[in-house]
Regions:
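GST-like domain detector, emphasizing the conserved glutathione-binding G-site
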Residues: 1-136, 228
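Domain-wide signal for the mature, well-folded portions of proteins, strongly enriched
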Residues: 7, 17-22, 31-34, 38, ...
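Short Asp/Glu-rich motifs
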Residues: 41-43, 201, 220-221
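GST-like fold's C-terminal all-alpha helical module
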Residues: 105-200
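Acidic/histidine-enriched, glycine/proline-rich intrinsically disordered or flexible terminal extensions
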Residues: 213-228
Length: 228
């Protein structure tokens, strides 16, 4: 592994966080480039040459570049030496359940929820309405969809363990990445089961290190306090 090139571009958003957490779980050494979204850093000639999408995150392993966070997360956990403390599915059922969590988080909560809200929120509230326009109805519908998805998955949240059992998996990386951004957006999570799961998860050392790599702080509360 000493000759491997492992790099990640991305900072201060929940999508790069997914890759950072996977890297920490696999105990890998990597180099990170702390570039932000819509700061101009993703539009340089040098960056566009390796990622024509002009977005973050971007993951590199030697000559392989992956520009979607879910794909990069999956690559990291499946390609390198396995961790004894991270769950990788061996049965079709468990693979499908992890995929179900991942797709629900990526599509329903992230794309159709969080990102729609960000696109149409006012700039002073961290939104992009200067680009996409204000759309209160779209924000309301996106928030309703998030709440509906949380209500739907509540029955599958364990009382004590991780989503797939005694070890965390990619399902947890995806779900926690979404829960953290919901808290950043001040979307109330009413489910005691989900809140208890969140409180357990944030204590994991690999999660904390991924938070530091992504947000410079080990907890969301510290990050919010520093950025107020």
């Amino acid at each position: 592994m000493n000759n491997e090139i492992i790099e990640i571009w991305g900072f201060k958003t929940f999508r790069p966080f997914r890759i950072y957490w996977a890297l920490e779980e696999m105990k890998l050494n990597y180099k990170s480039y702390k570039i932000g979204s819509r700061t101009g850093e993703t539009q340089t000639t040098q960056y566009l040459k390796i990622n024509p999408k002009g977005k973050i995150p971007l993951f590199r392993h030697n000559e392989i570049y992956i520009s979607e966070s879910v794909a990069a997360m999956n690559y990291v956990v499946q390609n390198f030496k396995k961790s004894q403390d991270f769950y990788l599915p061996t049965s079709p059922k468990d693979r499908a359940k992890i995929d179900e969590w991942s797709y629900m988080c990526a599509m329903e909560i992230d794309c159709l929820g969080v990102y729609v809200m960000r696109k149409h929120k006012k700039v002073k509230n961290g939104g992009l309405s200067n680009i996409y326009g204000e759309a209160p109805n779209a924000i309301h519908a996106a928030k309703d969809n998030i709440i509906r998805m949380l209500e739907a998955c509540e029955k599958d949240i364990p009382d004590t363990n991780w989503l797939m059992g005694k070890k965390p998996s990619c399902a947890d990386i995806m779900f926690m990445s979404c829960l953290q951004v919901l808290k950043l957006y001040s979307i109330e999570i009413k489910s005691e089961k989900i809140l208890s799961y969140y409180d357990r998860s944030v204590k994991r050392p690999e999660y904390i290190e991924a938070m530091i790599q992504t947000y410079e702080y080990g907890t969301l509360e510290e990050y919010q306090k520093a950025t107020l």
